[in-house]
From Swiss-Prot:
Name of the protein described by the UniProt record: tRNA pseudouridine synthase A
Gene this protein is translated from: truA
Taxon lineage: Bacteria, Pseudomonadati, Pseudomonadota, Gammaproteobacteria, Alteromonadales
GO molecular function list: RNA binding; tRNA pseudouridine(38-40) synthase activity
Residues the entry annotates as binding substrate: 109
Reaction it catalyzes: uridine(38/39/40) in tRNA = pseudouridine(38/39/40) in tRNA
UniProt keyword Nucleotidyltransferase, yes or no: no
Length: 261
């Protein structure tokens, strides 16, 4: 039988999602906990592999097990075997053809900036800190050039392995909530470092070091070296993954929950 789980995790505690030798990864911890409950080796497939330091409030995974278990075994049981910083939010049986990765139609990320003079003590690992004042309104104006289907070569990592630089951004907003600036972006898929590279350039616009139309110009130039530095990983969250309705994948509240949406 095939199961799907929704996970949340604090990426600052782990060296990214993907299993690696000699360092702690989210995938390794999840597979070890699931294997204890299944009483058999379990391998998982995730909706999107996050880098070291990147968080998730709604990472979706699927896995196959030979023997059924009650849903509570995959929630409370797995949580009791997971280390601090990783938790299951829900579990359910899914169709055998469901894929957490390939069945997804869109993914949504949030990037959170603490725009304060001094770095925060609480939530410091869950935000990026920029002490210089940022203008969220001009960042929002600039960001609209990225909505739609484009060649995002200017915003992909040099070692990105995707066969195509084209992605379709369905929504991109920048807003200020008190001391926080939230960049919220949805797309059919993302290139490696795409969100953090976009945010890095939006920060430059927010500092009034470049005009809003600079973002569109970067897109047209298709040159990563012309754009700004990659934003830090600590402010990035995978907050939602969308699937066709017939899979009946539950919606989770958008996170991180301390934002209070």
């Amino acid at each position: 039988m095939r199961m799907a789980l929704c996970l949340e995790y604090d990426g600052s505690r782990y060296y990214g999602w993907q299993r690696q030798r000699e360092v702690a990864s989210v995938q390794q911890c999840v597979e070890e906990a699931l294997s204890k409950i299944a009483n058999a080796p379990v391998e998982v497939t995730c909706a999107g592999r996050t880098d070291a330091g990147v968080h998730a409030t709604a990472q979706i995974v699927h896995f196959d097990v030979p023997v059924p278990r009650a849903d509570v075994a995959w929630t409370l049981g797995v949580n009791s075997n997971l280390p601090a910083g990783i938790a299951v939010r829900w579990a359910r049986e899914v169709d055998s053809e469901f894929s957490a990765r390939f069945s997804a139609t869109s993914r949504r990320y949030r990037y959170i900036i603490a725009n304060t003079r001094f770095r925060p003590g609480i939530h410091s690992a869950g935000v990026s800190h920029y002490h210089q004042p940022l203008d969220a309104e001009v960042m929002q104006e600039a960001a609209q050039a990225l909505v739609g289907e484009h060649d995002f070569t200017a915003f992909r990592a040099s070692h990105c392995q995707s066969h195509t630089p084209f992605r379709k951004v369905s929504d991109l907003t920048v807003e200020r909530r008190g001391d926080y600036i939230i960049v919220d972006i949805s797309a059919n898929a993302f290139l490696h470092h795409m969100v953090r590279n976009i945010v890095g350039s939006l920060i430059v616009v927010g500092q009034h070091l470049q005009p809003p139309d600079w973002i569109g110009e970067l897109l047209r130039q298709k040159d990563r070296t012309k754009a700004a530095a990659t934003a830090k990983p600590g402010g990035l969250y995978l907050v939602a993954v969308t699937y066709p309705e017939h899979y009946n994948i539950p919606d989770a509240p958008l996170g991180p929950l301390w934002l209070g949406d």
